[in-house]
Amino acid sequence: KKYHYEGLSFLHGDIADYTGTDSADMVVTLHACDTATDYALYKAMKWHAGVILSVPCCQHEVNKQIACEPLEGALKYGLIKERLSALFTDALRADLLEENGYDTQVLEFIDMEHTPKNILLRAVRRPDAGMADGQSGLTEAEQKSGQCCKEPDSKRLAETLQIHTTLQKLLEGE
């Protein structure tokens, strides 16, 4: 009300259960814990949101799954495994956004002295992109250049780390 926005609402609940819209101009998530970020990103992609700003929180899902022989020496230390898992989770999310029609950046949005959870996934929908509705997220030029035949970065990363995230499952289930 203070800023005179019309039609803006805030809801409290589980994003996985939310069915109240077919489209959104912008989706913002702040510290959505673990797989809640995946559900929010998936819904934002389904709604063809023009802009997605997401600040993920805890990423336990990958921490429970990650297994990578070349990284065994580092992954045996709980703290390092936790931090690497969080970074790999956000890298995978960024790759999936890219593959589904978004120009994506991974940014530090606030100094580490304020909070260690300071990664922002900023995704802007490409005007000529398909999306998570069964169409390719590649532009026509990328499809013509043969990039459509290249194995997606997200798939290679997930296979290397032996992980399968909620966002991957949601996108595969379409």
Where are these regions (language model features)?
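Class I S-adenosyl-L-methionine
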Residues: K2-E174
